[in-house]
Design a protein with these regions (language model features):
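Nucleotide-sugar donor-binding/catalytic module of glycosyltransferases
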Residues: 1-178, 182-189
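Long, charge-rich low-complexity segments
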Residues: 179-197, 248-259
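Short alpha-helical segments used as structural interaction elements across diverse proteins
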Residues: 1, 101, 197-199, 245, ...
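Residues within HEAT/ARM-like alpha-solenoid scaffolds
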Residues: 171-175, 194-202
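Generic structural signal for well-ordered, non-membrane alpha-helices
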Residues: 178-185, 205, 228, 232
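Membrane-interface aromatic/basic loop that binds lipid-linked glycans or pyrophosphate carriers
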Residues: 76, 213-259
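Amphipathic alpha-helical repeat scaffolds of TPR domains
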Residues: 200-212
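Secondary-structure edge/capping motif, primarily at the C-terminal ends of alpha-helices
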Residues: 187-190, 210-218
C-alpha cells in the first residue's frame, strides 16, 4: 500500500493504474482500456482476466454482468458501462472483473474527494483493494466501462495457498474478515439491500475459510470462536458459485450443522 500511495501522490499524468509486479499484461491492455474510456465517456475501465500458474492459464469465470448496460457503439455487449454503487456491486458479483485494482484504469481526477486523495489502507495484506474501490465508487458518480476480453494475467500462487493452509489462521484471514465487517457497517447508510447481501456472502466465505482451517488443525479454541461468528452471520444469499464450490460448501455446512 505504501508504494501505491506514494505513486498516486506523486503522479502527474491523466490516468492511473496499478499492476502487480509478478503478473503479466497484454500488449494492448492500456490502449484498449483508455480507448474504451474515451469512447464511452467514463471515469475508469475494467477488463476481464486470466489466472495462470506454471501449469498454464485458467480463464476468469465468466459472469452474467447483471446490472450493467451496453455501451454506446459496442458490439455483442463486449463493452458495458455503469457507475457508482452499481459498479462496485459488479466487482463483487462478477468473478471475471473482481474487486481488485490491477485490471482497471482510472482518471486521476476521480481518485480524490474534498478530503483529499483516496489512499490505500496501510498494513492490510488482503482486502485493501476492495476497501479502496468502495471509497472510489460507493455513493459517488464514478463511472466505469467493462471489457469482457481478458487483457490481464494474474499469477495464482497455489504453493502459497498450501503453505497458509498448513500454518493455520493468517493475517490474510483476519484482514479479510475485518474488511468485510467494516464495509458492511460503512454501507448501511446507502440502504442498498443487495450490496449488503453481497458483503455478507463474502464475510461468510472469509469466516468459513477460518473455520475449516481450525477444524483441520483441531484448533478447538479458535474453532469455537469462529464457528459462533459463522452462526451469527446466519443464512446468506450465494453469488457466483461454481458447481464444485457449492458442493464443497454444502458438505462443510452439513458437517458443521449450519443448514
Amino acid at each position: 500500500s505504501a508504494a501505491r500511495n506514494t505513486g498516486l501522490q506523486e503522479a502527474r499524468g491523466e490516468y492511473i493504474t496499478y499492476a502487480d509486479s509478478d503478473d503479466l499484461v497484454g500488449r494492448t491492455i492500456y490502449t484498449e482500456l483508455i480507448d474504451a474510456m474515451e469512447q464511452n465517456g467514463t471515469d475508469s475501465a475494467c477488463c476481464s482476466y486470466e489466472a495462470f500458474t506454471g501449469a498454464g492459464t485458467e480463464q476468469g469465470m465468466a459472469g452474467s454482468r447483471t446490472g450493467v448496460q451496453k455501451a454506446a457503439g459496442s458490439s455483442r455487449s463486449r463493452v458495458e458501462t455503469c457507475c457508482g454503487t452499481e459498479a462496485f456491486k459488479v466487482f463483487l458479483r462478477e468473478n471475471n472483473y473482481a474487486p481488485v485494482v490491477w485490471n482497471k484504469v482510472f482518471k486521476r481526477e476521480v481518485l480524490k474527494s474534498a478530503e483529499g486523495l483516496f489512499l490505500f489502507e496501510k498494513n492490510t495484506t488482503l482486502g485493501e483493494d476492495e476497501k479502496w474501490l468502495a471509497e472510489v465508487f460507493c455513493g459517488r458518480e464514478t463511472s466505469v466501462c467493462f471489457i469482457a476480453k481478458p487483457l490481464y494475467y494474474w499469477r495464482r500462487r497455489d504453493s502459497s495457498a498450501t503453505h497458509t493452509e498448513k500454518e493455520g489462521i493468517t493475517k490474510n484471514n483476519l484482514d479479510s474478515i475485518r474488511v468485510q465487517e467494516e464495509l458492511l457497517e460503512t454501507v448501511k447508510v446507502l440502504q442498498d439491500a443487495e450490496l449488503e447481501e453481497l458483503l455478507k456472502w463474502r464475510l461468510y466465505l472469509a469466516v468459513m475459510d477460518v473455520v475449516r482451517k481450525c477444524y483441520k488443525r483441531r484448533d478447538t479454541e479458535n474453532f469455537r470462536c469462529y464457528y459462533q461468528k459463522l452462526k451469527q452471520i446466519g443464512k446468506v444469499r450465494t453469488f457466483g458459485e461454481s458447481g464444485t464450490e457449492k458442493i464443497r460448501r454444502l458438505v462443510w455446512s452439513v458437517l458443521f450443522r449450519l443448514r
